[in-house]
Amino acid sequence: MKRKAIFAILPVFVLGILITNAYPASKEIKQRMIARLPVIKALKGQGIVGENNRGYLQFVGQKKEKEEVVTAENKDRKLVYKAIAKQQGTTAAVVGKHRAVQIANKAQPGEWLQDANGKWYQK
């Protein structure tokens, strides 16, 4: 129960702090993620990608623009989730699922999200 509470209150900037202490290359990861953010926001706004229920970006249709950006973002998210999992004594999969809930709560209207059962919907 305590872990759920911890994950429920972790905003994006805290993820950066946690990863900074847990992973030597954290500054580079954070910088890369920040640099990709405008492209990711645009892809979400166009309905090309959404946030899946595991905390990763996923293409929601046939159109796959900027695939290298999506792949790089997911790779860095995986590193972040692993580092947080190590600190929290859990798994990267659990961290990702909790992060997916946080992302869904902060998503903009019209963005694609995947619910816990795998069904895609627009917020």
Label each region the model flagged.
Residues S26-E68, A72-K75, K86-K123:
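Amphipathic, charged alpha-helical segments and their helix-to-coil junctions
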Residues Y81-K82:
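Contiguous, amphipathic alpha-helical segments that mediate oligomerization or scaffolding
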Residues M1-P24:
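N-terminal export/membrane-targeting signals
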